[in-house]
Each structure stands twice: as C-alpha cells, then as structure tokens.
Design a protein with these regions (language model features):
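Short loop/turn motifs at secondary-structure junctions and domain boundaries
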Residues: 53-58
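Conserved GNAT-fold acetyl-CoA-binding loop/helix
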Residues: 32-52
Length: 162
C-alpha cells in the first residue's frame, strides 16, 4: 500500500458510466498496481471488449467507486463456474485511505447473494486486509481445490458466507 494520504470525506457507489472507462483504463495500466494485483494490463481494444462483456453480462453487478467527487475505481460481482465472484480495482492515488474498504462494505450490503468469493494474490496485503475488514474469511478448502496458477502467482481465496 502507498502512504496514507488522509481519509476520504465520502465514498459512494454509482452506476458505471461510459466516461468512467477512461479512468478505469488508466488504473489497470498502472505498473505498480499491475504488480500488486498480479493481473496483466489490457490494451485499449482488449479493455473495451472486456468492459463490453461485463456490461452485457446479466449476472454482473458493477459500480463505480466515487470519493470526494472523483472516480476512484470500480467494484463488481459476477457468476462464473457456479460461484459468485468479486473483484475491485482502486487507483493507486487512492490507496491507504479506507476507500476500498468502505466501497466493499457498501457493495456487499447491496449484493445479497452469498457466498461471494474473492481471489487475491498472496502478496497483495492491502487487498487481503480490505477483505478481512469486510468479514471475508480465507477459504483453504477452495484453495486446495483450485488448479495451480497458470502465471505462477499464488492466490488466496476469501469467502463471505453471510
């Protein structure tokens, strides 16, 4: 995590708008964030296709994370292989301010389907802390069933049951 830059005054979730996608693209292209998330950046075309699929997916629930009037990131949940999954991405300039934690707390309050699973790179301590603060627990049983990572990056699996 980056240095603490002061707590955000307000965090809210809202519908993703077309204009948010440029902000999201910049977040996912940040080299430090890529390393932390252990997730490769997409080029513009791949990114546009990815978000077109998300927005067309009837199982996907997505929101823009807004703090102090600026788009700080995104959060979403979708069904895959019979599980409801969770993902979020917050711009590095917003790390360490409690924004991801507050956004996740709001999101899981609105998305009532359970269980919800989150996969996180073992070295992404900030994201692990966010999940734990929002009552997710590590699911070692799911980790044992998971195939070995194709990219060699060990993942932990967290679940919110209730």
């Amino acid at each position: 995590m980056g240095e603490v830059r002061g707590a955000a005054r307000e965090v809210r979730l809202r519908t993703v708008e077309d204009r948010d996608l440029d902000v999201f693209f910049g977040h996912q292209a940040d080299p430090e964030a890529i390393e932390m998330a252990a997730f490769p950046a997409r080029d513009r075309d791949q990114f546009a296709e990815h978000w077109a699929r998300i927005r067309a997916d009837d199982t996907a629930i997505q929101a823009a994370i807004v703090t102090d009037g600026a788009v700080a990131g995104n959060i979403m949940s979708w069904e895959q292989d019979g599980q409801r999954l969770l993902g979020y991405w917050v711009g590095r300039e917003y790390w360490g301010r409690g924004i991801a934690t507050e956004a996740l707390a709001q999101f899981v309050g609105q998305v009532t389907a359970r269980p919800i699973y989150a996969h996180v790179a073992v070295h992404n301590i900030g994201s692990i802390r966010v999940l734990e603060k929002c009552a997710f627990r590590r699911d070692r049983g799911q980790e044992e069933k998971a195939p070995p990572p194709e990219d060699g990056v060990e993942e932990l699996i967290f679940v919110l049951d209730a």
